[in-house]
Amino acid sequence: MTNLQDQTQQIVPFIRSLLMPTTGPASIPDDTLEKHTLRSETSTYNLTVGDTGSGLIVFFPGFPGSIVGAHYTLQSNGNYKFDQMLLTAQNLPASYNYCRLVSRSLTVRSSTLPGGVYALNGTINAVTFQGSLSELTDVSYNGLMSATANINDKIGNVLVGEGVTVLSLPTSYDLGYVRLGDPIPAIGLDPKMVATCDSSDRPRVYTITAADDYQFSSQYQPGGVTITLFSANIDAITSLSVGGELVFQTSVHGLVLGATIYLIGFDGTAVITRAVAANNGLTTGTDNLLPFNLVIPTNEITQPITSIKLEIVTSKSGGQAGDQMSWSARGSLAVTIHGGNYPGALRPVTLVAYERVATGSVVTVAGVSNFELIPNPELAKNLVTEYGRFDPGAMNYTKLILSERDRLGIKTVWPTREYTDFREYFMEVADLNSPLKIAGAFGFKDIIRAIRRIAVPVVSTLFPPAAPLAHAIGEGVDYLLGDEAQAASGTARAASGKARAASGRIRQLTLAADKGYEVVANLFQVPQNPVVDGILASPGVLRGAHNLDCVLREGATLFPVVITTVEDAMTPKALNSKMFAVIEGVREDLQPPSQRGSFIRTLSGHRVYGYAPDGVLPLETGRDYTVVPIDDVWDDSIMLSKDPIPPIVGNSGNLAIAYMDVFRPKVPIHVAMTGALNACGEIEKVSFRSTKLATAHRLGLKLAGPGAFDVNTGPNWATFIKRFPHNPRDWDRLPYLNLPYLPPNAGRQYHLAMAASEFKETPELESAVRAMEAAANVDPLFQSALSVFMWLEENGIVTDMANFALSDPNAHRMRNFLANAPQAGSKSQRAKYGTAGYGVEARGPTPEEAQREKDTRISKKMETMGIYFATPEWVALNGHRGPSPGQLKYWQNTREIPDPNEDYLDYVHAEKSRLASEEQILRAATSIYGAPGQAEPPQAFIDEVAKVYEINHGRGPNQEQMKDLLLTAMEMKHRNPRRALPKPKPKPNAPTQRPPGRLGRWIRTVSDEDLE
């Protein structure tokens, strides 16, 4: 799960459940290994709006139990009145002993209108307060917004029709299970006796100094004198206990005290009242002890408690009006809230206030809570439990994502529509292999990518990627490879343990390597002058990132930079690459903060910003320039990168700076340039050719430079400007004789700066080469693999092929490509590509491939719903369909993978039967047996129809049953002598006699009588 190269386990279920609780529960991947079961509990309430149209909903988003929140309505006097508690659908303590909350989300909205109201009005304010409910000082509709300054924890003026969504985000990790206050076996004289086991983990204790030599004095009154000795804020929604004692002293005979403790709710009403002393007489001249020992169970706390009050009633035995009463008191009390300091139990709280909603409207609260639950012994007999899986990578990834939630836009309260829009983004965050397209649109791509790089361990590969080659060699040869394999794959490497010629930059890199710094560098080597062109970066420099920025219609030239690390004093290792743009002027506003303020001077005294101040740039420029990292380039704009990359050192960007200084293009030049231009007009070769080609090709650009690049520009400035494809000048007029960087003798032949080989032979490298040759001689398959690798390197597509391999782990696409590549010389090949070369003919998927794709789609859809057993293989065995309701019920109850093609009807609730009336059955039988006017159906046929209704649980016959009933009716009609007579068939009409033709005026027509 934590390996980015693993394509089969790419989802982090825990963070997906945290950000999208409706996808279902997931085990917390920490090291608390307890056998448990996962369960989702829904909460749905339709709350009626009061007369004022305003109210308040208090949520405890992190409470590990059945309590979700409470609803209060605002009264006309400006005070809130408690309405009801909000709980999960199932009372968890009745069936489970221990619990851990995984995730929770709740939605508040209104979509109903009372009678006489024709428009949905009203707004909602919501805020998450990082404290307890009693600590809020202003709970008015507008005052709530001042409870926090964090913009991601509050929203205001959301229409009630749109609604708000409350998302529970953890405040701590690696927590233990909480006892739910479940009932335990007990026997007592009172049949109503109940014993529960409450949570004692992390209690919250309030210590109250009730009296410190408090002096009371008053005159006698009938019924006694009542005072409030103390009132203090506390928070409790679970069981609590009160302990302590007060000591009273008096000099008045016959004084009698009574003490009462009140537990007061958020609305100011007394929820629980306990008399701790009644008619307690005081003795003069001594200490009178008044102990307190109260236990309040959870089932008596019917609404959130926010304060406690102690009242003392003083009276006098046989007292008369005017008698003096006085006493003094000292002592303290402790109020213990069981489990009150468990993270999320009492803080934070989320308050959702609605205002100006029509009286009588319904505000709907709906949500889901996901738990890890340990069942009680009775339920454990029939419920399968399993261990959670310890996954430090997934846990660290979750912690880092949520620690950056303010920068990633992850809120605790959302407008519901916005939260729905963010679901695809959350799914992308939970998928470690996602390309972060949506995150890039929101501007969070670089942050998440940096977090993945830190949190998720990645399989280390050779660079350029030659991991398939290394694995093919086997363990016997793998240890011989390493840095030398990179040299063999075409990357310039210094011999391990061998010193290079010293220079200032090399010494800087050595110092940086000793300190563990990262180095972003362009490396090239010319004879007798080894130079490292790079960027010195502090450790962990890539951990932060910023949003992207786009620059439109800005002239720029491009050049690639290779990111490397220094493993030892002289051996750099390439890791990645980045494209940079040269822009005219001082444009530090376009640079990441890590590059601002750093510049290097040219020979003419101008500045190039974005470079480290390392000497002088060997160019004569006519103006200042700024070098900025970019992520993409389009027709006339570039996308800037805000990765915290430090300033560049070296000369490989000189070619791009010189071109910018001479031609001053008005739009970005869509060709990247590589090579170091010196003061003599010579262009020096660079190493890491494959890496730089991949950098340019990744952006759809060609790479121009001296040597085997997409555009070979030659070894000097004169040939470069003639061959460069985007040069805007007419070369027939030869206007470049006096250009800067052109040597005095324009006809002088230049030689390549890179005369030496790309890497030096070393004993270790020779051993590695011999080992590979020996393996190739023994294994023909490895010989073929080596030939393929050399072919990839010669054509500069090693990196492209490695990236393609990551996207095609099972080589399905490659097999299809090879299977459908037409042979050279075929008819279709000649028609498309001429007489030579290869191509790919388009074709649709085979039925088997289409079926496999369908199985994969079904499996992915099931996975998004939290149904992980429905793999593509399982779906194929199940008749290429998803799990049935019975299979889902079986998996939810047993957590075992159901057998394909098994319906598990015992796990599906039986359909409720509906009894059909005799009139309905008779009407159906008559309709089926014959048309109106025919004989009535016999009783046997009516009984057959009644059986069908009984089988269908009160529903009429389906198509197959209707066919059977029609056949039965036909048979009964032929056997029944009392069946209606068939209607007579109509006789065919006799042909009419043809009328005689016109015979004339004097001719008589001959009739049959005349013929007789």
Curated annotation (Swiss-Prot):
InterPro entries: Birna_VP2, Birna_VP3, Birna_VP3_dom1, Birna_VP3_dom2, Birna_VP4_Prtase_dom, Viral_coat. Pfam families: Birna_VP2 (PF01766), Birna_VP3 (PF01767), Birna_VP4 (PF01768). Residues 513-755 form the Peptidase S50 domain. Keywords: Capsid protein, Host cytoplasm, Hydrolase, Metal-binding, Protease, Serine protease, T=13 icosahedral capsid protein, Virion. It comes from the Viruses. It is an enzyme of class 3 (hydrolase). A divalent metal cation binds at D30. One of its GO terms (cellular component) is T=13 icosahedral viral capsid. This is Structural polyprotein.
